[in-house]
Structure formats: structure tokens, C-alpha cells
Amino acid sequence: MRPGGALLALLASLLLLLLLRLLWCPADAPGRARILVEESREATHGTPAALRTLRSPATAVPRATNSTYLNEKSLQLTEKCKNLQYGIESFSNKTKGYSENDYLQIITDIQSCPWKRQAEEYANFRAKLASCCDAVQNFVVSQNNTPVGTNMSYEVESKKEIPIKKNIFHMFPVSQPFVDYPYNQCAVVGNGGILNKSLCGTEIDKSDFVFRCNLPPTTGDVSKDVGSKTNLVTINPSIITLKYGNLKEKKALFLEDIATYGDAFFLLPAFSFRANTGTSFKVYYTLEESKARQKVLFFHPKYLKDLALFWRTKGVTAYRLSTGLMITSVAVELCKNVKLYGFWPFSKTVEDIPVSHHYYDNKLPKHGFHQMPKEYSQILQLHMKGILKLQFSKCEVA
């Protein structure tokens, strides 16, 4: 073979190999790509492509979290709670009578909403109360706000007056006796049967100031649920008449029972009805004669009238405010933080468990005298707005 022929044969062989190579590669590429994908899936354990990003060896591997999901749930809950707040306002303004189950459903919904104190809401509401009523100066009768010679009108029997003579004037403190005002943490303890087995006693007793209503029991087994500390307790004059025989033959029993309240203030509505005056004064003189540690105070009738007008504008139109709402209103003015316990005007819990009216008995109030569900809807609004906090169920025990 000629030298030129050998060179041509070599070139022809190379061209043939190149042609075969080109024909073979396109047919194999899809198969190879499938292998790479399967290998990639194994390496990433099925992670979606959207979460697989190119990165240098120094870049940290990103972690898939549920923070977005949690944020969405939080926004949904916030929106739900806002709607619930508006719903309660509308609910309380309705003239239609709502059933106990309606209220319990609302309370169930409220319990799913996280509570947070709202300083601005609290300040605004407190300012409105101070403007209309001014508990700091006018909550109780004092020598400063009721001088000798005043003709004081009764709260309910407003056409009747009592002249303030020296013998009455000397029963009054010189000024408001709440020297440590404003108190940081206050507990207003109602008497609802919801307190039974609540284990709230320790938490209540840690408060700076504890308000109670109508001489409730605080010793023995109940103390673990209701606490034992008392700074101020109201007394309904009917208790003095019915339970203590108007402090005649049962004076000793009265003095024995009140010893459990330490140096608390006893608050009586001496100037609400004329029938209350003599009984309230009898309590004052009994404590003076026995040199008891407690001091007697009297609700100022004008304060109570102004307070009733304030709540009337919000739909509470009953014959008279309950003691619980009166004291709650006082606490908002005297305290920075207010928590309510034992406020439960219903016959059962949200779990449908029967509840006694009081934690110590099941005696119901006079029909129509107070407007408990209407008042309670107002308190629910204060809770939802972060002005005060309602304890609905058992307390957390450390």
C-alpha cells in the first residue's frame, strides 16, 4: 500500500469512531439523567426541589421549620379574639335576654385568647372612672369630704337626708385611709362557688391588697382556695341583723368571727338606705368598745350614685349595682393591676359541672335586685381589653 493510502485509511477510521460516538451519546443521555435524579432523591431523602438550594461547602444547611405555620395560626387567633371582643360589646348592648349557655360559650371562646395587660386601655378607663366618681377622694365618707353640718342625701332614698352632726362626724376618718395607694397588685375576691377546689389561696394572699365582700369565711379548708389575707371587706347590714341578732345577744360571736380578718377595714353602706344607718353605726360602736383591730368605713352615697350612673350608660340598669361591681370599680382606681377571683354568676362551669352560688352556700340573691349577667358581660369586656384579669378556673400551683 502506498504511504498516502495508509494515512487516508487512518483518517477514515477516526471519522467513523467520531460518528458512532455522536450517535451513541444522545440515546444514553436520558438514561444517565434518570440515574442522576434517583441518586439526588436518595441523597436529599425526598426534600422538595424548592428547599434544595445551591450552596458552597461553608454555607450552613437550611432547616425547614414550622414558624410560618405558627405565625399564620397566631394571626388567625388574634383576629378571632378581636372579633370576639367586638362581639361581646354587641352582645352586652342587646336588650334580648341571653341564656346561661350563650354566656358559657362566650367564656369558652375567651379562654382560648391569651391575656395581656393593656396599659393604654387601663389608663383610659381609669381616667373615665376618676372623672365621674373619683374613688381616691370620694369612695368612703371622710371628714375632708363631709364636714360637720352637711345634709347628706341617701344613695337610694335620695329624697331623704341625714344631718352630719359632731357625733357622726367623729366616726369618719380624717381623709381616705389608703396610704399606700396606688397598690401594685390587687385581688378582688368574689364569693362564687367556682372558687371551690380552685387552689387560688396562695396566689390571692400574695397580692398587695385584697378586697372581699360580705364577711365570707376564710379559715379552715377553704383558705387553700380563697386565701386568708384581707385588707378590706364589705358588710351587708342584713348579715348583722340576721346572723348576729343586731349585735345584742350575739355580739360575742360577731367579735369572735371578725378576729380572723386581722386589721382589715370594714366597709358598710350606712347611707344607702335609712334602715342601714343604725345597724352600721352599731358595728362602729361595737368595735370601738371592744378595742378591735379593725376600722369601720362607710361608703359615700354620692360616690355610689355617680358610679351607678356611670354603669347605667353602659347598659347596667338594675335596681342597684352588686357589691362586686362596686368594689371592682374602686380597685381599678386604687390599683395598678387588678385580678378578679370567684366572679361566676352561673349555675355550672363551662364543662357543665354544677356550681353553687357561693363557695360556702347556695343562697341566691333577690330576683331583679342585681343584674348579674349584664354586669358580668361588662367585666368580660374589661378582661378582653386588658384592663383587669378574670380568673375563670383553677389557679396554677407551683
Swiss-Prot record:
Residue numbers binding substrate: 214, 236-238, 322-324
CDD domains: GT29_ST8SIA6
Localization, UniProt: Golgi apparatus membrane
Record topology, Lumenal segments: 25-398
InterPro entries: Glyco_trans_29, Glycosyltr_29_Sialyltrsf, GT29-like_sf, Sialyl_trans
Metabolic or biological pathway: Protein modification; protein glycosylation
Disulfide bonds: 186-335, 200-395
Family named by the database record: Belongs to the glycosyltransferase 29 family.
Membrane topology note: Single-pass type II membrane protein
Entry keywords, A to Z: Disulfide bond, Glycoprotein, Glycosyltransferase, Golgi apparatus, Lipid metabolism, Membrane, Signal-anchor, Transferase, Transmembrane, Transmembrane helix
Source species of the chain: Homo sapiens (Human)
Major location (coarse): Golgi
E.C. number: 2.4.99.-
Catalytic activity: a ganglioside GM3 + CMP-N-acetyl-beta-neuraminate = a ganglioside GD3 + CMP + H(+); a ganglioside GM3 (d18:1(4E)) + CMP-N-acetyl-beta-neuraminate = a ganglioside GD3 (d18:1(4E)) + CMP + H(+); a ganglioside GD1a (d18:1(4E)) + CMP-N-acetyl-beta-neuraminate = a ganglioside GT1a (d18:1(4E)) + CMP + H(+); a ganglioside GD1a + CMP-N-acetyl-beta-neuraminate = a ganglioside GT1a + CMP + H(+)
Name used for this protein in its record: Alpha-2,8-sialyltransferase 8F
Enzyme class: transferase
Entries under PANTHER family matching the protein: ALPHA-2,8-SIALYLTRANSFERASE, ALPHA-2,8-SIALYLTRANSFERASE 8F
Cytoplasmic side: 1-3
